[in-house]
Amino acid sequence: MKNNKKGFTLVELLAVIVILAIIALIATPIILNVIDDAKTNAAKNSAYGYIDALEKANAQDMLSSESINVLSGAYTIDESGKLMHDSAEVAVKFKGTKPTSGTLTYADGKLSSGSSITVDGKKFTSDADGKLTLSK
């Protein structure tokens, strides 16, 4: 009589499980880093969007009024996302995650070095060119 046993042995199945576990151990930190980088980039894009919205609001204000008010001084963002300048709230139309804190300092209409903005718990600081970098 012919013996036709088909299937995998217990040792073969255990070997496959061990290999899959090793692959999972290697892949998990990589995937988590990709997710964290995506969250950081999303927060950075929201920060840039908020800054652009402020600058656009100022440009619209200059077009609709007869005076030219170049962005200057410190603009402070409170916990609720309100932007304050000289004790007055500045209206900023913005879609995205609002910042929770920060101080945007402008000189002659240009974002100054050392300005900061926090979005989703990630604090970004500007350099002399207005580029935002994540503060550790």
Regions found by a protein language model. Give the residues of each.
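Periplasmic/extracellular, small/polar-rich flexible segments of pilin-like filament-forming proteins
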Residues: 56-136
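Short coil/turn residues that cap or connect secondary-structure elements
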Residues: 5, 39-42, 58
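Aliphatic-rich helix starts adjacent to a transmembrane/signal segment
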Residues: 33-51
